[in-house]
Amino acid sequence: MASDEKLLRGEQTQAAIVQAAYRLFIQNGYHGTSMRQIAREANLAVASLYNHFESKEQIFIAVLERYHPIFEILPNLSRTDTSDVSEFVHRAAQFIANHLDQRQDFLNLFFIELVEFRAVHIPRLLEKNEPLLTSFIQNFVAKKSNLRPFPPFVLARAFLGMFFAYYVTRFIAGNNPTLGGEAHVLDDFVDIFLHGILLEENEA
């Protein structure tokens, strides 16, 4: 019983450290955050951090695993129920947009990993969550449609890349229609992803 209570306290302390580090990383960046600051934010002694994590980088990896939205998004995408690939892509894009609207911290976390770590941790995290990623891709390619024969992982990367381009440029465009900031622009991105930018001969 005592060992169970000790384990529970340890898990609670780890969670407090990760939560405190997350707030500081979002605010100050990785290199702008010290172990001392994390300890103070978590109401712990600095030495206590090292009882749970070997380094600040290990804490950051735990933050990614806990807070990166891709691991909240993938389970929902894999359960999207429609047999039509066009509808699936539209639904998936809208779900991601709605989810990220509630996660304004996403870009901060993403760019810390991309700029300060050169995305070194993402492959490992994707491997760790491979069943979720595989389920999403299988759901993608299993739809009855005339998909061109691209490798499934390439299709998934193209979709996620399209959406990331939309999300980042949305902050640049704002609501300016001249810069493509209209409310329906996500549908335009999805249409380009599905059909490209060239007119078919019978449309020209």
Tell me what each language-model feature is:
Residues 141-191, 200-204:
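Hydrophobic/aromatic-rich alpha-helical bundle segments in the mid-to-C-terminal region
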Residues 10, 18, 64, 89, ...:
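Amphipathic, non-transmembrane alpha-helical scaffold segments
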Residues 71-72, 98, 119-145, 153-154, ...:
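Amphipathic alpha-helical packing segments from all-alpha helical-bundle domains
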Residues 63-92, 133-142:
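Amphipathic alpha-helical linker/stalk segments
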Residues 100-120, 168-173:
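Amphipathic alpha-helical segments used for helix-helix packing
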Residues 19, 86-112, 153-157, 187-195:
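Amphipathic alpha-helical segments that line or abut small-molecule/effector binding pockets
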Residues 1-12, 76, 201-204:
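N-terminal intrinsically disordered/low-complexity leader segments
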Residues 12, 16, 20-58, 62:
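Helix-turn-helix
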